[in-house]
């Protein structure tokens, strides 16, 4: 939570800058280059985006940016019926046998998670639009 820009929290941004010997600064000043690097290192690589089927990769990545890598990974694992350890590996990737069904089930579960948050009444419409857009784009990518 807290200060966020493009799904990147101040804490994630500060950690990224510290690892590169840079001083912390408000996430509102994040550059596009930093956004791309953080998305790749902090989210895409950690959900094994390069190994997941097209479309599923995007749906899991976007979920990870907004709700954390662990949650996105465990929800994917639940959807495809493997142990939910939060680490996407060969078993998880191999279990994604139907990308369309996986995308739909993952987006449904994501919405279920969001609906149960106490801030859903405030932010729910925006979250629902985002998930709807992610679903549509992921399904288009998968076909």
Which sequence ranges carry the predicted segments?
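Cell-wall polysaccharide-cleaving catalytic domain and substrate-binding groove, primarily
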Residues: 1-143
């Amino acid at each position: 939570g807290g200060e966020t820009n493009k799904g990147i929290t101040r804490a994630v941004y500060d950690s990224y800058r510290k690892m590169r010997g840079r001083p912390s600064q408000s996430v509102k000043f994040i550059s596009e280059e930093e956004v791309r690097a953080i998305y790749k290192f902090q989210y895409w690589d950690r959900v094994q985006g390069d190994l997941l089927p097209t479309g599923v990769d995007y749906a899991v990545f976007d979920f990870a940016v907004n709700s954390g890598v662990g949650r996105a990974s465990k929800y994917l694992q639940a959807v495809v019926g493997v142990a939910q350890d939060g680490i996407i590996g060969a078993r998880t990737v191999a279990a994604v046998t139907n990308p369309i069904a996986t995308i739909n089930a993952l987006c449904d579960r994501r919405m279920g998670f969001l609906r149960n948050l106490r801030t859903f009444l405030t932010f729910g419409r925006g979250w629902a639009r985002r998930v709807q857009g992610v679903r549509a784009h992921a399904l288009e990518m998968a076909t």
